[in-house]
Amino acid sequence: MGKIRKLDDQLSNLIAAGEVVERPASVVKELVENSIDANSTSIEIHLEEAGLSKIRIIDNGDGIAEEDCIVAFERHATSKIKDENDLFRIRTLGFRGEALPSIASVSELELITSTGDAPGTHLIIKGGDIIKQEKTASRKGTDITVQNLFFNTPARLKYMKTIHTELGNITDIVYRIAMSHPEVSLKLFHNEKKLLHTSGNGDVRQVLASIYSIQVAKKLVPIEAESLDFTIKGYVTLPEVTRASRNYMSTIVNGRYVRNFVLMKAIQQGYHTLLPVGRYPIGFLSIEMDPMLVDVNVHPAKLEVRFSKEQELLKLIEETLQAAFKKIQLIPDAGVTTKKKEKDESVQEQFKFEHAKPKEPSMPEIILPTGMDEKQEEPLAVKQPAQLWQPPKQEWQPPQSLVREEQSWQPSTKSIIEEPIREEKSWDSNDEDFELEELEEEVQEIKEIEMNGNDLPPLYPIGQMHGTYIFAQNDKGLYMIDQHAAQERINYEYFRDKVGRVAQEVQELLVPYRIDLSLTEFLRVEEQLEELKKVGLFLEQFGHQSFIVRSHPTWFPKGQETEIIDEMMEQVVKLKKVDIKKLREEAAIMMSCKASIKANQYLTNDQIFALLEELRTTTNPYTCPHGRPILVHHSTYELEKMFKRVM
C-alpha cells in the first residue's frame, strides 16, 4: 500500500485554518470584509473575552441565499471570482473561498442570514460538521456568531496572548477597516461596552478623529495626487505630531488595508528631514489603481501585496508629500493649558499639551529689549554685545518640588506615548454626553491647514537665553529658536548643494585605509567593485578577506573620510548596492553639524539678526537635518491667555 494519501476535507480545513485563522483578530477581519463585500452599510461587532469566547458580526448586507449556505462552507467556494481572468482583476476584499470553512472547522459557528426575498436560513456548524439547518424568520442581512474558538485545537490556544493583547489586535484591525471604508458605519463592542462607533458618512477625517482624537485631526494635512496609473488620497500629520512606531501609518490599496514596508518608507521619505530619527507620522493613504497592477494573491491573509509599477508609485507618494509640505508654514505652536472637558482630548494629547510649553520660567533669564519700540518696523541695530545680559556663573535651579513633580511623571510618560495604535482612545465611550453627532460637528468645524506657502515670516530678535535659544517676535507673537538647529539647517543646504555638484574627482590618501571583512561581507563587496569605482572609490584586494583604499572622492568631508568609507561598505553589505545620493546627504549632515554654532555660545544682536535672515533663505526653515524643530511659536492670544488678559 502506498504511503501517500489524500487528506479528508475536515483535516484539510484544519490545516488551512492554521494560515487563515491565526487568532480572534483574523476571524473578525475575514467576517467584516465579507460583510463589506456584501454591500453592507452598517456592521456591528460584538466580542466576549477578546473573541476567544464569542465573536458576533451583524450586518445589513445582501445576505446569503438558502441554496448557497452549505456551499459557502466548502473549501474554495466563492461568489467573487469565476475564472482566471477574474483573479487578476479583483475588486472585492475576499476571493479565495477559505475563510468560512477555516473558521467553521475550529469553532462552534451559528449563521442566520436572509436575502430579504425569502425566508432566512439558520445554520449551526461545530468543528466543520453541520449540526442543524432550518428556515427562520430574519431581516435582510447576515448575523454570524463564532464561539469557543480553537476548542478542538487546544495547541493553538496555548499561543494566544492575554485578553488585553488579543483585544488590542482586534481593535487595530477594526480601526484599519474603518479608515479603509468610511462609508460603512462600524460599531465595536467588548463585553457589552462600546469601543468604537463611526457614522458611515464617508468622511475619513471623522474616523481619524474617533481613533486618534480631535486634537490629532486638527493637525492633519490633506494629500491628493493622480497619475496615469495611480490615484492617491489621504491625510498625514504635521511633523510636530509623531509617534515612536510605524504602526500609526495605514496604507490602503483598492479599499484593502495592506502591510507594505516600502509604502511606509515612501511616506517617511516624503517627510525627508522633517522628522526626528526614530519618530514616525500618523498617516492614512488610500491608493486606487488598476487591479492588474497589484497582486493580492500573495498570502492567505491577503495583507501582503506586490506592485507591478512599484518605483513609479513610491516616487509619486514622496513627491506628493514633499509638495504638500512646501505649501505650509511648519512652525509648531507651543500651546497653552486651558480648561477643556476630558472628552475633547485623548490622554496622549493632554500630556503633549501640558508639557509642550516651557516649564521653568525665570525672570533673570529674560534679555533686555534692544531698542525696539511700537512704531518701528525694523529692529535697531545694536552692535555692542555688552548690552546683552550675561548669565551668572551659577546656573539657576528649579525648586526641588518642581523637580520631584517632573520625575513622578516620567514612568507614565513612556507608557502613554509609546503605546501602539490600539491603545490610543480618543474618547470615553461611556460618557453619555459625548455623542457621535458632537464629534461630527467638531470635525466639521476643523479649519483646513492654510496652504499659503512655507516661507518663514520676518522675525525681529529681542534676546537670547542660556546662549542657546533666541527669542524673536513679529505681529503673530513670540518665537523661540534653537540657534544650533537653525545654523545646522543653513549649513546643511549649503553643503548639500556643494557636495551634489562635485565632479567625480579623487584624492589620494596619505596612508592607505585597510578594511577587514567576514567572508560573506567580502564576497558582497567584491560583487560591487565596479559600482564603487563609478562613484570614485577604488578598492584593492589585500590578503584573503581584506581591501585597502588608496584614494577617495574629493567630496568626502575632511577628517571624516574613513567614516564615509565605512558607511559605504555597510550599504554594500546590507543593501547590495551603493546609494550615492544617500551617502552625499549623510556627508552634508555630518559637515553641517560640526560647522554649526554650539549651545552656550552667546551672539551679538547683529549675529542673531543675520542668522534669522539667512534661515529665511533656506528651503526648509523649520527643522534641522535630523528632524528636530528649529523654532516654536507662542501666539499673541496664547500669551494673553497665560496672563489672564483674556478669559
From Swiss-Prot:
For this record, an example GO cellular component is: mismatch repair complex
Q: What is a biological process (GO) this protein takes part in?
A: mismatch repair
Q: Keywords on this record?
A: DNA damage, DNA repair
- Entry-linked Pfam families: DNA_mis_repair, HATPase_c_3, MutL_C
Q: Which CDD domains match?
A: HATPase_MutL-MLH-PMS-like, MutL_Trans
SMART domains in the record: DNA_mis_repair, MutL_C
Q: List the disulfide bonds.
A: none
Q: Which NCBIfam families match?
A: mutl, PRK00095.1-3
| Its biological purpose | This protein is involved in the repair of mismatches in DNA. It is required for dam-dependent methyl-directed DNA mismatch repair. May act as a 'molecular matchmaker', a protein that promotes the formation of a stable complex between two or more DNA-binding proteins in an ATP-dependent manner without itself being part of a final effector complex.
HAMAP family to which the protein is assigned, alphabetical: DNA_mis_repair
Q: What is this protein called?
A: DNA mismatch repair protein MutL
List the source organism. Bacillus cereus (strain ATCC 10987 / NRS 248)
